[in-house]
């Protein structure tokens, strides 16, 4: 079969607190697999005002270093793979304006949506848990 996009735009780093390995390890694995484009998309930081610390995303202070690290690796591996840097974000109105300003200020390439929470992670349920039961199609298999 031909025509498959050899790309991955949903790659997290250690900064999101639930990924393992270094950016370099991810890049080298992608090259070995024949991936042409690799996008890093850590969970976007949220500017929590009350001191809340997320367990699934980097802090606002880590964002510039994250973008810088991926950009530097992009230069190093430019002859082998195209790297992109962005964020995976939920649409949470109270944070969106500040997140968008940070995204623009840092010169990110893209943002993907991953609506893990219906509201802020402080006030809303983790919605991914709503979809963990088998699908109706899976229940009919023996």
In which residue ranges do the predicted regions lie?
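Short, flexible micro-motifs
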Residues: 24, 117, 138
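An N-terminally biased module of ancient metal coordination in phosphate/nucleic-acid-related enzymes
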Residues: 1-93, 102-103
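Short glycine-/acidic-enriched loop or helix-start segments at secondary-structure transitions
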Residues: 50, 122-123, 142
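Hydrophobic alpha-helical segments and helix pairs
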Residues: 90-133
């Amino acid at each position: 079969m031909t025509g498959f996009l050899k790309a991955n735009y949903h790659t997290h780093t250690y900064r999101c607190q639930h990924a393992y390995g270094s950016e370099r390890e991810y890049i080298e694995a992608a090259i070995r697999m024949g991936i042409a484009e690799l996008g890093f998309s850590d969970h976007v930081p949220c500017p929590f005002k009350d001191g809340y610390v997320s367990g699934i995303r980097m802090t606002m202070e880590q964002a510039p270093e994250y973008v810088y690290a991926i950009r530097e690796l992009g230069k190093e591996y430019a002859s082998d793979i195209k790297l992109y840097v962005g964020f995976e974000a939920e649409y949470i109105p109270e944070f969106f304006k500040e997140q968008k300003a940070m995204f623009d200020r840092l010169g990110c390439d893209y943002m993907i949506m991953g609506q893990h929470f219906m509201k802020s992670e402080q006030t809303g349920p983790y919605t991914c848990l709503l979809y963990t039961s088998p699908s109706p199609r899976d229940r009919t298999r023996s």
